[in-house]
Structure formats: structure tokens, C-alpha cells
Amino acid sequence: MNSNKLYEAAFPYAEDVLALPVEDIDRASAWYQEMFGLKEVERLDDPVPAVILERDGVRIGFAINGGDASNDGAAILVTDIHRARRELEGKGIEIGNWRVDENDGQKLQVFFVIAPDGLCYYFHQPIGDGEDG
């Protein structure tokens, strides 16, 4: 296991974490590579233009599929929420709503990022009692 691994999993808000809606594949690929540290691993033209990016074995994809980016995004499970926050803030990304959520009895330290394309990302990490904030 790579001790530098940060991304553990990604889950879609709507239908498909490999087809999040964007209007410009090239712009999306460049931004997510620079800001989220993703690497382009696949580009498709059929059935719609799409690009698949990856970090730490976790894949997130973007497609020109007519979807509404403002109603979509992904929940990204990370191994170190504080490191994820520092990394993104260090690149000038505004972090929103740093808080503790509870889901099915599990506390999660979370924050949100709204990307320039309108997609929303919910970064989260399970925490134990006494580890809040």
C-alpha cells in the first residue's frame, strides 16, 4: 500500500462518476490535472466526447453529455482530510463548509469544493470520537 495515497474512492451524486457533465473536455482535463492532481488515462469520442482521469487508482470521468453540472459532482473519500484540504488550498481552491457530518452513526470530517465547471465535490474521511475538526 502506498503511504502517499490520498484518494480512496469516488462516488457519483447522480448516475456515473465516469461521466460527470462538462462543456469542454480539454479544459476539464487540464483543470482537474492541475488542481486535483489527477492524470489523464483515457479519452473517448464515442458515444460522446469523454475523458477519464485517475489518482491513486481512483477514476473520475467527464463527458460532454448534456447533463447539468450544477446538479452533479462526486463524493471523494480520502485517507487524510487535512492533507486534502491543505493541498487544494495551496493551489488557490476555495474550500467550503468545513464540518463534521454524521451518516449511519459514523462521523465524517468533510468539506466541499465547487469547481469552475459547476460540479460539486464532497471530500470526506471517517473520524473517531475526539478527532473532530
PLM regions: where:
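Short amphipathic alpha-helices within nucleic acid-binding modules
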Residues: 31, 82-87
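Eukaryotic phosphotyrosine signaling hubs
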Residues: 15-16, 71-73
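Short, well-ordered beta-strand elements within core beta-sheets of diverse protein domains
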Residues: 20, 74-76
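Vicinal oxygen chelate
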Residues: 1-11, 17-20, 41, 52, ...
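Core segments of cupin and vicinal oxygen chelate
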Residues: 9-13, 19-59
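A short local loop/turn or secondary-structure capping micro-motif enriched for an aromatic residue
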Residues: 68-72, 129-132
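Helix N-cap motif at beta-to-alpha junctions
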Residues: 24-25, 78-82
